[in-house]
Amino acid sequence: MSEMEKITIENIVASTSLAEHLDLSKIALALEGSEYEPEQFPGLIYRLQEPKTAVLIFRSGKVNCTGAKNLDDVKKTIDIIIDKLKKADIEVYDNPDIIVQNIVAVYDLESNLNLTDIAMSLGLENVEYEPEQFPGLVYRVEEPKVVLLLFGSGKVVCTGAKEENEIEQAVIKVKKDLQKVGLI
């Protein structure tokens, strides 16, 4: 089993642009169940059940998609929004570029970790560990540029990845680093 098969993607945040300008009041009427309260938040929130995602739509035409577990769901979500807006006679781009901003994933090293020893071994320039503040160790990986949160249980949360393969690279790197110093 490859490392990627053991990694669970929890959330993908992606962005796109659907137009130069959008009338959010008109969209709020067109998208049943949407939330638009401009005095509290400048964007319109719309939640989909399938795929289970949410989009934030802004007057500037920018759209953020969150909650997707894979890239297909991101694309499907954006396509659904485009379709619904076009049906409401709201002009939007046909096939906008979608940019992944962040992928959050979880991995289990299947071994308890001594975070104090790890903090000493991995070098203070890339590690933050203050157990009184937060129970995990923050490990900033240079290449790929991601942040790993390591917990005593052996669970690892990866954040900051833009591509799925970066998560796998980071997991392989941290495993090698920990094996090299005999901590797993």
From Swiss-Prot:
Keyword Amino-acid biosynthesis on entry: no
InterPro entries: TBP, TBP_archaea, TBP_CS, TBP_dom_sf
Domain of life of the source: Archaea
An annotated GO BP: DNA-templated transcription initiation
Pfam families for this protein: TBP
Listed HAMAP family: TATA_bind_prot_arch
Protein name, as recorded: TATA-box-binding protein
Organism: Picrophilus torridus (strain ATCC 700027 / DSM 9790 / JCM 10055 / NBRC 100828 / KAW 2/3)
